[in-house]
Amino acid sequence: MKLTILFGGASFEHEISIVSAITLKEKLSNFELNFIFCDQDHTFYLINASKMRATTFSRGEYKKMPKLTLSHGSFVQKSLFGSVDISGTVLNLIHGGDGEDGTIAAILDFFSIKYIGPRVDASVFSYDKRYTKWLCHARGVKCVESQELSSSEHSNIKIAYPIIVKPSRLGSSIGVSIVKDESKLDYALDSAFEFDNTVIVEPFLEGVKEYNLAGFSAGKKFYFSIIEEPQKEEFLDFEKKYMDFSRSGNVDSAEISKELESKLRASFEKVYKNLFEGALIRCDFFVVNGEVFLNEINPIPGSMANYLFDDFGGSLKLLANSLPHTKRAKVTYEYIHSISKAKGK
C-alpha cells in the first residue's frame, strides 16, 4: 500500500510530529511510504526515507530537499523536466495547530486529496477542550466539570482545590499545571495564558483509574484497539509525553471487567459516530466509582497509537479503503447558459 505521511506543521507540537513520523517509518516498513514535511513557514518538502532522522530537521537539512506544491488530487514535485504527482493516501500526522485544528483537513479537502485524519468539523470539536465538553453533553457522554477563564478573569476560580489548569487548545501537557492551593495559582495561569487566550480549569481527580482506547470505523463497523491503563503518575509532563510519542512496541491490555470494557467502547462510539469517520483517534478516559468520564479526544494520537493495535498496518489499510466521500457540487453553468440564450447571445 502507498501511504504519504504528512508531518511537521507550525505548532508547539512540531517536534512531537517529527518523532511520530520517524517512529511510523519503522513500524510501517512493509508499506510504500512517502514523507512530506511541513515547516514552520508552511512550505512542503519531500523527504527521502533515508533522511528520516531528527537531525535532518533540527539542522535545517530538509531545506535542500524538493519543495512541493498542491494540485487536484495530490502533492506535486515540479522540475525542469515536468512534474510528478506524489501518489498514495495521505496520513495527517501533524499534531497540534495546523494538523488538529482543521487547517490541513481544509487544504486536503479543497484539493480533493484522500487522507486519513479528522475532517474539519471533527477537528473543531476535538481541538478546543471547551467544544469537546459541549460534544459530550450533546451525546450523553460524561466529562469532568470545568470552568472557562479568559485573561481578564485571572483568578476568579470557583472550583475547589486541587485543580488542574490547561490551555483550551493544546495537547501533550504543554502549559498544564496542577495547583494544590491558591498560592500557586497565578504562576499556573500565567503559564497557561502563554499558549492560549482561554484556559480551562478542572478539579484534579486523585485516585482515579485512567484508560486509553483507540479505534476507528470502517464499513459501518467499529474496530477497537486494546484498552491501555497508562503508567500511574500524578502528572505526565511534556518531556515524558514526548518520549511516549516514540513508542512502537505493543503494550499489555488492561485487566478490566467485560462490563467496563463495554462502557468504554460505548462512550467511544458516541464520541466518534457521524463526526470522526476517516480518522483513527484515541480517547482518554477517567473511571470514578465505575462511571466513565471522557478526559480528552486525541484526533491524531502520538505515533497514531500504533502500540495499542495487534495489527496496526492492517488497521490503516482497512481505514484507507473506507474513507468518507464528500459530495461535491457539479458545476454546469446551466444558469448562465439559460440567461445568455434568453438574451440571444
Curated annotation (Swiss-Prot):
GO terms for cellular component: cytoplasm. Keywords: ATP-binding, Cell shape, Cell wall biogenesis/degradation, Cytoplasm, Ligase, Magnesium, Manganese, Metal-binding, Nucleotide-binding, Peptidoglycan synthesis. Its cofactor is Mg(2+); Mn(2+). Mg(2+) 2 binds at E296, N298. Residues 133-332 form the ATP-grasp domain. It is an enzyme of class 6 (ligase). Pathway: Cell wall biogenesis; peptidoglycan biosynthesis. It catalyses: 2 D-alanine + ATP = D-alanyl-D-alanine + ADP + phosphate + H(+). One of its GO terms (molecular function) is metal ion binding. Binds 2 magnesium or manganese ions per subunit. Belongs to the D-alanine--D-alanine ligase family. This is D-alanine--D-alanine ligase. Cell wall formation. PANTHER family: D-ALANINE--D-ALANINE LIGASE, D-ALANINE--D-ALANINE LIGASE B. It is found in: Cytoplasm. It comes from the Bacteria. Its EC number is 6.3.2.4. The keyword Manganese applies. Mg(2+) 1 binds at D284, E296. Its main location: cytoplasm. ATP binds at residues 160-211. It comes from Sulfurimonas denitrificans (strain ATCC 33889 / DSM 1251). One of its GO terms (biological process) is cell wall organization. The keyword Cell wall biogenesis/degradation applies.
